Swiss-Prot record:
Reported function: Non-selective voltage-gated ion channel that mediates the transport of anions and cations through the mitochondrion outer membrane and plasma membrane. Forms a high-conducting channel with a stable open state and a voltage-induced closure with a mild preference for anions over cations. Involved in male fertility and sperm mitochondrial sheath formation.
Protein name in the entry: Non-selective voltage-gated ion channel VDAC3
InterPro entries according to UniProt: Porin_dom_sf (IPR023614), Porin_Euk (IPR001925), Porin_Euk/Tom40 (IPR027246)
Domain comment, as recorded: Consists mainly of a membrane-spanning beta-barrel formed by 19 beta-strands.
Gene3D superfamilies, per the entry: Porin
N-acetylcysteine sites (modified residues): C2
GO molecular function, one term: nucleotide binding
Cross-linked sites for Glycyl lysine isopeptide (Lys-Gly) (interchain with G-Cter in ubiquitin): K54, K110, K111, K267
Post-translational modification summary for this protein: Ubiquitinated by PRKN during mitophagy, leading to its degradation and enhancement of mitophagy. Deubiquitinated by USP30.
Subunit structure: Interacts with ARMC12 in a TBC1D21-dependent manner. Interacts with MISFA.
Catalyzed chemical reaction(s): chloride(in) = chloride(out); K(+)(in) = K(+)(out)
Subcellular location: Mitochondrion outer membrane; Membrane
Disulfide bonds: none
Length: 284
């Protein structure tokens, strides 16, 4: 088993309590299906933003060649951007994944791509991404070490065109079955931390704190999720800007999920400007 998370997944449980079950200011529909054999997967989503009226959508198809560990993914969105991803996993070595990710914009002819590699084991995970740019690619790298529940991570990016580090981040945390602690420092100026607690089978809570050196702008938030039953959940969160988020998620039937959410400005309650959201998830 390769259970060590990537750098981006550190503190993920706390982030999920804050982010999942909400969709303020939009109507969203997600559709997912796959072939009987599981070799082909299809997904599409559409968003309509209530404040601007702008709509967007995307389509993704995925084809797996399991005997060779290959996965081919095609992506398209309403901005007419085409993406192709080819990944090869667990064949050269257990836990090793190699990926080629390309993007093409037909309207402008713009092309871009990345080469990605990651390797995960029980006590560590490492990875690197390289932009395909002959004028001077940017190299991204990260590493996470795990020991008896403790996690330490480092993330960097190096701009070869300017020969300097453009990102320099550190993280430290602790992970248990029902408790997670995560702290991070980005570029020596941005500090943050989060705490996740699974109180019982029905209640999850999270606290998030962040601040920037040389600034009085401190961000603080509390979030909670409560499972009414196996099909229904309530979510709530509030931050120090007096923004209150409420969410209701109901599984109407297997594969059909409804989400209702609202964002309330507590400082200007009578002035309006609040946002509501509606989401449908369909899976077959």
């Amino acid at each position: 088993m390769c259970n060590t998370p990537t750098y981006c997944d550190l503190g993920k449980a706390a982030k999920d309590v804050f982010n999942k079950g909400y969709g303020f200011g939009m109507v969203k529909i997600d559709l997912k299906t796959k072939s009987c054999s599981g070799v082909m997967e299809f997904s599409t989503s559409g968003h309509a933003y209530t404040d601007t009226g702008k709509a967007s959508g995307n389509l993704e198809t995925k084809y797996k060649v399991r005997n060779y560990g290959l996965t081919f993914t095609q992506k398209w969105n309403t901005d007419n951007t085409l993406g192709t991803e080819i990944s090869w996993e667990n064949k050269l070595a257990e836990g090793l994944k190699l990926t080629l990710d390309t993007i093409f914009v037909p309207n402008t002819g713009k092309k871009s791509g990345k080469l990605k590699a990651s390797y995960k084991r029980d006590c560590f995970s490492v990875g690197s991404n390289v932009d395909i740019d002959f004028s001077g690619p940017t190299i991204y790298g990260w590493a996470v070490l795990a020991f008896e529940g403790w996690l330490a991570g480092y993330q960097m990016s190096f701009d070869t065109a300017k020969s300097k580090l453009s990102q320099n981040n550190f993280a430290l945390g602790y992970k248990a079955a029902d408790f997670q602690l995560h702290t991070h420092v980005n570029d020596g100026t941005e500090f943050g931390g989060s705490i996740y607690q699974k109180v019982n089978e029905k209640i999850e809570t999270s606290i998030n704190l962040a601040w920037t050196a040389g600034s009085n702008n401190t961000r603080f938030g509390i979030a909670a999720k409560y499972m009414l039953d196996c099909r229904t959940s309530l979510s709530a969160k509030v931050n120090n800007a007096s923004l209150i988020g409420l969410g209701y998620t109901q599984t109407l039937r297997p594969g059909v999920k409804l989400t209702l959410s609202a964002l309330i400005d507590g400082k200007n309650f009578s002035a309006g400007g609040h946002k509501v959201g509606l989401g449908f998830e369909l899976e077959a």
